[in-house]
Amino acid sequence: MVVNHISKNIQKNCNYIKNRLPSEDILHFTFNTLDGVACAIFYADGMVNKELLGELVARPISALKLKNEGGMYETTFENIQKNTLFPESKEVKTFDEVIREVLDGNSALFIDGVSSVLIIGAKLLPVRAVMEPPTDIAVKGPREGFIEDIKTNMSLIRKRLKTPDLRFETLRVGKQSDTMVSICWL
């Protein structure tokens, strides 16, 4: 049986997302609010503006108090949306929606004790299509290639193939060149 509804336990939620999206280009960071409530943000590397995400989302949320003396959550997602500067955000309640949004270039904010997720539109998608490289002219076959750095190329693939089955593994090869390469597969 596949679990699709989000738990109130942030650790269970994070483990579920890591298992469903095990590719190394799906990243996350954790932080706590002022009163110690754990939060986690998941995003696809190269598809999100990390600086804006940290400055305009994580920092303001970490300055909030989410609990009162009785341990109940006072601050709702609407309140969090007021304290962050991203106008594009929405609440979702299933893992399928979370995964679809993360693969689409949005960020997912999990909060311990909350059984829904705030999707934050902090997209920074690559702006060009995969095209023929100027120095590698093919006589036969497809005329598509990658000409940017490896992270941009990975995000171009992720932008085109929005599936949780896409995997990346990055490694260094070559004694002289010490070149970063990425192996991609479905």
Could you tell me what each predicted segment is?
Residues 1-186:
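Membrane-embedded alpha-helical signal segments
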